[in-house]
């Protein structure tokens, strides 16, 4: 199933909730009020994208004719073991990594690529080539299990002093921590304190 943006997910979930509770879909105005969009044209744009991605079907001759067509797709996805994992676009200090404000979109992922509870998993897009010797390339999606501790040698996602997420290999040394790139041309990062956001448990690469 094609991934949805955060806003598209909000609209889709609202439509589905209304259809399932009331038996009929909400109006464009109601959708806009529910998700904080004042412009009806913006709502129509999101509905068009949801339709093109196969989540809904609309009848242009009827104002409220929004049919949820992805329920069956979701059932099929569950049978095939597919989960929708949050993709983290930024990391905010003092806020849980999977907080709504950090999530850019949701990405459909085969369940066999994870080895833990779905709620503990998030995805981070890799930027740069600091981990290429570990087989992690620029543009890859690393699958991360949320946790705050790490063992020496673990590949982790850590928060830097600039409040940015970085993927490095973790080592605890005497009186300091070392975040080691897997790139022989790069120097390690030494920190007195480090915030571990999660451990990399898998990798997804789009060909």
UniProtKB/Swiss-Prot annotation:
Superkingdom of source: Bacteria
Protein role: Represses a number of genes involved in the response to DNA damage (SOS response), including recA and lexA. In the presence of single-stranded DNA, RecA interacts with LexA causing an autocatalytic cleavage which disrupts the DNA-binding part of LexA, leading to derepression of the SOS regulon and eventually DNA repair.
Enzyme class of the recorded protein, top EC level: hydrolase
Assembly and binders: Homodimer.
Listed EC numbers: 3.4.21.88
NCBIfam families with a match to the protein in the record: lexA (TIGR00498)
Residue ranges of the annotated DNA-binding region, renumbered to this chain: 28-48
Keyword set includes Transcription regulation: yes
Alphabetized Pfam families for the sequence: LexA_DNA_bind, Peptidase_S24
Catalytic activity entry: Hydrolysis of Ala-|-Gly bond in repressor LexA
Keyword entries, A-Z: Autocatalytic cleavage, DNA damage, DNA repair, DNA replication, DNA-binding, Hydrolase, Repressor, SOS response, Transcription, Transcription regulation
A single GO molecular function term of this UniProt record: serine-type endopeptidase activity
This protein's name: LexA repressor
InterPro entries the record matches: ArsR-like_HTH, LexA, LexA-like, LexA/Signal_pep-like_sf, LexA_DNA-bd_dom, LexA_repressor, Peptidase_S24_LexA, Peptidase_S24_S26A/B/C
Species of the source: Staphylococcus carnosus (strain TM300)
GO biological process: one example: DNA replication
The keyword RNA-binding is assigned to this record: no
Location of the active site: 130, 168
SUPFAM superfamilies documented for this protein: LexA/Signal peptidase, Winged helix' DNA-binding domain
Site (Cleavage): 93-94
Protein family (similarity comment): Belongs to the peptidase S24 family.
